[in-house]
From Swiss-Prot:
<feature type="signal peptide">
    <location>
        <begin position="1"/>
        <end position="19"/>
    </location>
</feature>
<dbReference type="GO" id="GO:0090729">
    <property type="term" value="F:toxin activity"/>
</dbReference>
<keyword id="KW-0732">Signal</keyword>
<keyword id="KW-0964">Secreted</keyword>
<dbReference type="InterPro" id="IPR031565">
    <property type="entry name" value="T-conotoxin"/>
</dbReference>
<protein>
    <recommendedName>
        <fullName>Conotoxin TsMLCL-02</fullName>
    </recommendedName>
</protein>
<keyword id="KW-0528">Neurotoxin</keyword>
<dbReference type="GO" id="GO:0005576">
    <property type="term" value="C:extracellular region"/>
</dbReference>
<keyword id="KW-0800">Toxin</keyword>
<feature type="propeptide">
    <location>
        <begin position="20"/>
        <end position="54"/>
    </location>
</feature>
<dbReference type="Pfam" id="PF16981">
    <property type="entry name" value="Chi-conotoxin"/>
</dbReference>
<comment type="similarity">
    <text>Belongs to the conotoxin T superfamily.</text>
</comment>
């Protein structure tokens, strides 16, 4: 008989700790978007440095 109140208390404590699937999906989408943005910024930086170097070699850039 004592197990029932303990079980109910454990259920009440565990239910708010369960992750919300929508919240987890939003967090993973935000992380993925941030990684894609960082990757695009890196590619833009690499391309701009290559173009700048080529421009200096050819004499197009000041």
């Amino acid at each position: 008989m004592l197990c029932l109140p303990v079980f109910i208390i454990l259920l009440l404590l565990a239910s708010p700790a369960a992750p919300n699937p929508l919240e987890r999906r939003i967090q993973s989408d935000l992380i993925r978007a941030a990684l894609e943005d960082a990757d695009m910024k890196t590619e833009k930086g690499i391309l701009s440095s290559i173009m700048g170097t080529l421009g200096k070699i050819v004499g197009l850039a000041p």
